[in-house]
Amino acid sequence: MPTPIREKISNEGAEIYCEHRGNGPILLLVHGGMEDAGYYSSAADILADKFTVVSYDRRCNSRSSGDRSVDMTVTQQARDAASIINAVGDGKALVVGRSGGAIIGLELAATMPEMINFLIVHEAPVIELLPQI
């Protein structure tokens, strides 16, 4: 199993912890709430033979810093994801987001579509987007 490269990427007043391993197109894995980069460790090890797999601790979570006194927005977190894509790769990525991470992936696709080659959204809490039943 490949040993991940661990680093912190500075973005807008935060130090975002990320780890990446493997070679190939960038595959950014965005975790949900109450998780961190470690959530994807097993999957990252398996996928690293085909991709450069990147996972990270979202702003103000686990090993990442940030100003907890300021409201965090999905837009801010999408900019954090974009900064990681730019720092580790060539400005484009396949993105997989789970739960709250899926919302970040959707925001990234809506506001910076040029950064996304493909987006997989898993368990996105988007109930407000559904029609009234």
Model-derived regions, located:
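Short glycine-/acidic-enriched loop or helix-start segments at secondary-structure transitions
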Residues: 39-40, 64-65, 105-107, 130-131
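Catalytic nucleophile-loop/oxyanion-hole region of alpha/beta-hydrolase
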Residues: 65-77, 129-130
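Conserved acidic catalytic loop of the alpha/beta-hydrolase fold
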Residues: 75-93
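Short loop/turn motifs at secondary-structure junctions
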Residues: 4-5, 23, 89-91, 115
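A structural alpha-helix within SAM-dependent methyltransferase catalytic domains
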Residues: 48, 82, 110-113
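Conserved hydrolase catalytic core segment
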Residues: 91-130
